[in-house]
């Protein structure tokens, strides 16, 4: 079988010319720099785009890597928060190896941020607060989904949803599932990427040696 190559894929490219990233303009604290870029990403954002969508990469003890899109749900106490099913593939991999990578790409700004760090579960109280702020259908969906497990059919899943709706009618509180909640990523490195002409992009990386340290070292990387 021949390789699948869509027409002209090798010629698909954009010229990046919206701006630059210089050390003199970058914040000394990468969290402040992230906040600045995130706020700019919210400006003139296309209505189809979720600027808090990020790629979460995890790995198991054998070194196999899995990546997927999750939603950033907050930055609190200098940690990046997201929520998911603890029994999912990512949940089991993070139990085995708490080192993770996050990547946010904002094409309308021609920018990307990579974050590497370690992950811990948030408190059940924090998970409950967020869970009950979600739309009711999303709360029910968290109960129905046995994430990453094989299921017989979509119909079986929808039947389970109907049963849960009958069990928890409007006006009753839906409990937080035991296997669902939040994670907090403590960053150890950031890389801020700004697209530039001629593929000579700007890349500034911040690193620290200790999770309790506020002493970040900034360096420029070759594109």
Curated annotation (Swiss-Prot):
Report the cofactors: FMN
The EC number(s) this enzyme carries: 1.4.3.5
Which parts of the sequence bind substrate? 13-16, 73, 130, 134, 138, 199-201
Signal peptide feature range: none
Q: Pfam families under this entry?
A: PNP_phzG_C, PNPOx_N
What the entry lists under SUPFAM superfamilies is as follows: FMN-binding split barrel
Q: In which pathway does it act?
A: Cofactor metabolism; pyridoxal 5'-phosphate salvage; pyridoxal 5'-phosphate from pyridoxamine 5'-phosphate: step 1/1; Cofactor metabolism; pyridoxal 5'-phosphate salvage; pyridoxal 5'-phosphate from pyridoxine 5'-phosphate: step 1/1
Q: Which UniProt keywords apply?
A: Flavoprotein, FMN, Oxidoreductase, Pyridoxine biosynthesis
Q: Which cysteine pairs make disulfide bonds?
A: none
Residues given in the record as FMN binding sites: 68-73, 83-84, 90, 112, 147-148, 193, 203
EC main class here is oxidoreductase
> Which GO annotations describe the biological process of this protein?
pyridoxine biosynthetic process
UniProt remark on cofactor binding: Binds 1 FMN per subunit.
What does this chain do?
A: Catalyzes the oxidation of either pyridoxine 5'-phosphate (PNP) or pyridoxamine 5'-phosphate (PMP) into pyridoxal 5'-phosphate (PLP).
**Quaternary context:** Homodimer.
Regarding protein family, the annotation reads:
Belongs to the pyridoxamine 5'-phosphate oxidase family.
Task: Tell me the protein's name.
Answer: Pyridoxine/pyridoxamine 5'-phosphate oxidase
Q: Where does this protein come from, organism-wise?
A: Rhodopirellula baltica (strain DSM 10527 / NCIMB 13988 / SH1)
